[in-house]
Amino acid sequence: LARDFSAVVLAARNAKALEEVAAVVKTTGTEPLPLALDLSQVEASQIVVNTTLERFGRIDALLNIAGAVPQIDLFEMTDETWKAGMELKLHGARRLTIRGWDALKQAKGSVVFISGSASLDPKPGFAAVAATNAAITALAKAFAEQGIKDGVQVNSIVPGAVMTGRRRSFLEKWAPAHNMSVEEATKKFPEEAGISRYGQPEEIAELLAFMVSPCAKWMTGTSVRMDGGEIKGI
């Protein structure tokens, strides 16, 4: 994205991580604007949009990738846990897209939502993840329908098992609880899922960049699965 745009606005809760990513963006010659905000808070999305327009005057692309929903058994999830997961990943993305819609219309811009493969193969231990991701895919479709009229392109990505810091942390907690080493746990999932390896964040980033590029302008209302072949259904 930093290769394709002259400026990139970054919004997340972790200020340190934001600054690290902003430093990398800057090395490409692109101007970064890091905003330490919690997008689960109602007012945060308007702050992002207002600050972006004040600084750069336009919004060409919006990538909704914030949010992690807890992987807790279906019968152990509380209402508060459900609400917290939905508030950031689903409603945070919904609010940000609505607040930025007028600017996206003016720029004939693009929006991408990140869902997840749990929505296509729900399990009891991933019920909240699956439900939230399914809602995101449906939300993206609804925005895409409006986008046809308004000139805004909207799609979603359904990634599978990507080796992120969050996944490593999960494996470090999951492994001892199941009497195995982290190495064994890390190896176990791809074998059980029928995939050759974990995905890398850079691979998802390349797909994101393509979906907001001129090459993909006729793509809208589409959900693209990138999971190494984990989901076998048609």
Model feature map: region roles:
Residues D102, E145-Q146, K217:
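Alpha-helical segment proximal to the catalytic Tyr-Lys
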Residues D121, A209, C215, T220-I234:
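Short C-terminal tail/terminal secondary-structure segment
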Residues M180-S181, A193-I204:
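A conserved structural motif in NAD(P)-dependent oxidoreductases
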Residues S110-I136, A140-K149, A161-V162:
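Catalytic loop of short-chain dehydrogenase/reductase
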Residues L63, I148, Q153, M219-G221:
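Short, small/polar-rich loop/turn modules that mediate ligand/substrate recognition or access, typified
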Residues D73-F75, T81-M86, F189:
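Substrate-binding pocket helix/loop in short-chain dehydrogenase/reductase
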Residues F5-E20:
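Conserved glycine-rich Rossmann-like NAD(P)H-binding loop of the short-chain dehydrogenase/reductase
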